[in-house]
Every structure is written in C-alpha cells, then in structure tokens.
C-alpha cells in the first residue's frame, strides 16, 4: 500500500531512466505495470528486465501462503502486460515447496511462457532459522494433514536438514528428489 501511495520505486526508476542505468525488478505485485511508461523505453535500450514470482496456480493456496500478494492469475496477467510492452520477463517459480506446490512446476512454466515470459528460474523453499518455526506453524494451521510429509520431503532434498546455507545447494537442494525437480524444470523449459 505504501508503494502505491508514495511511489518510491517509480521515483527510483525515473532517476535510473534519466541516466540510462540498467535495472532488474523482482516482484509478486501487479503494481509494476504502473511503471510501463518508464520500463518499456528502458527495455528497448536493453536496460530493464522484470522477474515475476509465481508460487502456485491455486488461488486458495496462494491466498493462504501470500495473503498480501497478487493472486496467481493476476501475476500471469502482469507477465503478459509486461511482455506485450517489450519488457523481458523471467518467471520465478519460487518457492517450490515439496509435497505442496512442486507438482505445479510444469504448469506454471507453461502458463508463464504462454503469457510471454522469456526466461525461467526456480528456488526450492529455504527455511533459515528464523523461518523454520514460522513455516511449521503455518503448516499446522493450513495443512496439518500434510505437515510431516512436506517437512520430510524438504529434509530429503536438503541433506537431512530443513535449511542448507552452502552456496549452490541452498537454492536448488541436493539428492535424488532435488535432481528430479531440476530435470523436470529443464525438460519443461526445453519444450517451450
């Protein structure tokens, strides 16, 4: 709400545009389309890209997980609007939550590509110490029947822990399930 009112990002973009300085924006918000008049000319010069994070296509789950963020369909509309304006868009499937959202990986990539995304990435759920308990509480409230399965799958993909800080593994995980997720991602991207 404060960005909508104060336009801080827009004022920064105005300065960057005036000086032909490159910018990459990562967002879950549809508000980024407000600044098309700045981003499109910058993109035409190769100076602007936008990454839009899509966690799930399930509107109900999205509301429970990210109550203040744009709904999945709105994010896909945002990708379409940005792409139509000539802005290179990356879809970021993030976070991928084993046994909760991982089955949607291909569908998200396909829908985002259809909307105009030209790049894609994914990030396996990361639970640093300060988030581990919070996520556990969220699961107890919203998915109590799946809590242990989700946490166990995450541990399998993180070498027995819920979080791994090691560079190269913290975003993707390790082990057979993590390799399978990466292969599914690569195969879907190749087919698009």
Where are these regions (language model features)?
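Short, well-ordered secondary-structure micro-motifs
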Residues: 36, 62-64, 102-103, 132-134
